[in-house]
């Protein structure tokens, strides 16, 4: 359900929870952290991208064969070696793809910076201000839009490249 909400809703949830008159601020009696600027952006982006990362990693964890862990333990590997070779190694492609996906979502997001970004500028707010600001400058806005396009294309190509590192097992026996 959180993935279906507009991103500005996350900013409003942060304001209503952690703001000066927020629910958690009233509960604890003190504002836990400054929600405007970098702190608010970081917190908003984490709660915005956490469900996507969780779904990707959880899905991959379902495809990891548990028999490899048993074999690793029988062969005398330590707990750390078992974890690194049988859990973390198959997850590397998904972890990298999750990081790229989260970067792409945060890079193109406008709602969270608009609500809790404060004076902290991100590319999406710069594009909005150039195109729809008080004095629109379409030439500069077009340059910013093209500059936004380059990391987006690189992200898509990187995701396509990382797809080959996803977990794939062929069943030899049942």
Predicted regions and their residues:
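Transmembrane alpha-helical segments of polytopic membrane transport and secretion proteins
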Residues: 160-174
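Hydrophobic alpha-helical segments that mediate membrane insertion or helix-helix packing
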Residues: 1, 70-73, 127, 141
């Amino acid at each position: 359900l959180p993935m279906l909400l507009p991103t500005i809703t996350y900013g409003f949830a942060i304001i209503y929870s952690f703001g000066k008159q927020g629910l958690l601020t009233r509960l604890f009696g003190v504002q836990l952290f400054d929600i405007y600027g970098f702190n608010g952006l970081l917190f908003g982006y984490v709660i915005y991208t956490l469900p996507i990362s969780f779904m990707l990693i959880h899905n991959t964890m379902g495809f990891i064969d548990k028999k490899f862990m048993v074999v690793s333990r029988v062969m005398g590997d330590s707990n750390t070696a078992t974890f690194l070779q049988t859990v973390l190694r198959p997850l590397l492609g998904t972890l990298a793809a999750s990081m790229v996906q989260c970067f792409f979502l945060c890079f193109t997001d406008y709602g969270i910076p608009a609500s809790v970004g404060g004076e902290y500028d991100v590319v999406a707010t710069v594009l909005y201000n150039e195109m729809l600001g008080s004095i629109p400058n379409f030439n500069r806005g077009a340059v910013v839009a093209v500059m936004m396009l380059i990391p987006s294309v690189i992200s898509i190509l990187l995701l396509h490249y990382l797809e080959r590192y996803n977990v794939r097992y062929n069943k030899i026996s049942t």
